[in-house]
């Protein structure tokens, strides 16, 4: 099965055919660095990191560009409020973004350009647009004329006349049409500026991505990505100005990830349901957040809630427990030539093919992880039955590891991950870990003395506080429910 991707431009899944055989050029809109990143940013960046990883796994040489928007109204407003230069704000939050992305296990893109380092390229594109009649200067500003580009709104499928008639749209004094957008903004007091043919000023948001993508990927490239919220106006305007300037198609495949909802409501600062990545990682392991974000298809909306994060943590823990069980069984004394379980052998051997088929169907990570859980269930059954051929278990481990390497998951040492998760859960309990261990010792003594009533009381007391005791021949361990 060849890779098929959903193209927002056509509204259908299409066979993925690159401009150059074996090479992919991909541009993804980065963040505006004026504040801490929220979980919507986490989703977009994890999704395109997954796509980046899978394309390389599939044998492509990938040039991946993700920018920083480091000059913008929001950055300037924050800088003025704090009384510092705008670049102090942008550099601070670039560093915060980089820390967040490293925690989430993202591979570095090929290039991470900053808008402020590409002003000359932006001015060159604007000059071409003015010369071709697609843009006009107006008292220090430069605007793109949407009526001059007859394919405007082809990405979002909106209607220009209906939008013009909308009550919320007002014609500015300088604009010829209410939907015309700024390519260059004349300087204002208290704002950074650069020299240009139209006077001192700074670029508009949309021209930044066009100029940077053209510099690193050329006038036409394979994939342009971002969140669904960028389809209009940002990506629509990028297409208009880029294709008007170059007379060529801009990007062939437009890929957009779905929204993040908070407890079934749209994430919004005004609703008070706005969570930064930093806040989430104080309560949850970074790999749990990444696993949660990849557990749904990238185009589907995803509901962020404590319950869903806890379920993701439990699912990831099941996988790590299976890996730990495999490692223990493979390392155990013996010949390793036990019974060969046909179901386990088939699922282990078949996982790479099933994984590829799922991912080739528009990067369906939800289906891919479903196949991993199928294998994990077979592993757990076989481990419980005992007397299994270690080579088959090792092949199951290798198959899961290969999937994890592509998705950026299952990279921790299993025992260490389980302990890390246990420690996080224990930190939220109303009882200290040392007290749990003391009660387990008391329970062991009670059982040895055949005081089963006291042993049961201790078990029930711990259960009421969310602690589950696990008795085995090796002793008693505990976990958080």
Swiss-Prot record:
Class of enzymatic activity (EC top level): ligase
Gene3D superfamilies with a match to the protein in the record: Cysteine-tRNA ligase, C-terminal anti-codon recognition domain, HUPs
Localization terms from the record: Cytoplasm
BP terms from Gene Ontology: cysteinyl-tRNA aminoacylation
Family: Belongs to the class-I aminoacyl-tRNA synthetase family.
Protein name: Cysteine--tRNA ligase
Residues reported to bind ATP: 269
Gene for this chain: cysS
Reaction(s) this enzyme catalyzes, per UniProt: tRNA(Cys) + L-cysteine + ATP = L-cysteinyl-tRNA(Cys) + AMP + diphosphate
A GO molecular function held by the record: ATP binding
Gene Ontology annotations for the cellular component aspect, listed alphabetically: cytoplasm; cytosol
Oligomeric form and interacting partners: Monomer.
Membrane-crossing segments per the record: none
EC code(s) of this entry: 6.1.1.16
Binding-site list for Zn(2+): 29, 209, 234, 238
InterPro entries: Cys-tRNA-ligase, Cys-tRNA-synt_Ia_DALR, Cys-tRNA/MSH_ligase, CysS_C, Rossmann-like_a/b/a_fold, tRNA-synt_1_cat_dom, tRNAsynth_Ia_anticodon-bd
Entry-linked HAMAP family: Cys_tRNA_synth
Cofactor: Zn(2+)
Residue span of motif 'KMSKS' region: 266-270
Textual note on the cofactor: Binds 1 zinc ion per subunit.
Location of the motif 'HIGH' region: 31-41
Keyword vocabulary terms for this entry: Aminoacyl-tRNA synthetase, ATP-binding, Cytoplasm, Ligase, Metal-binding, Nucleotide-binding, Protein biosynthesis, Zinc
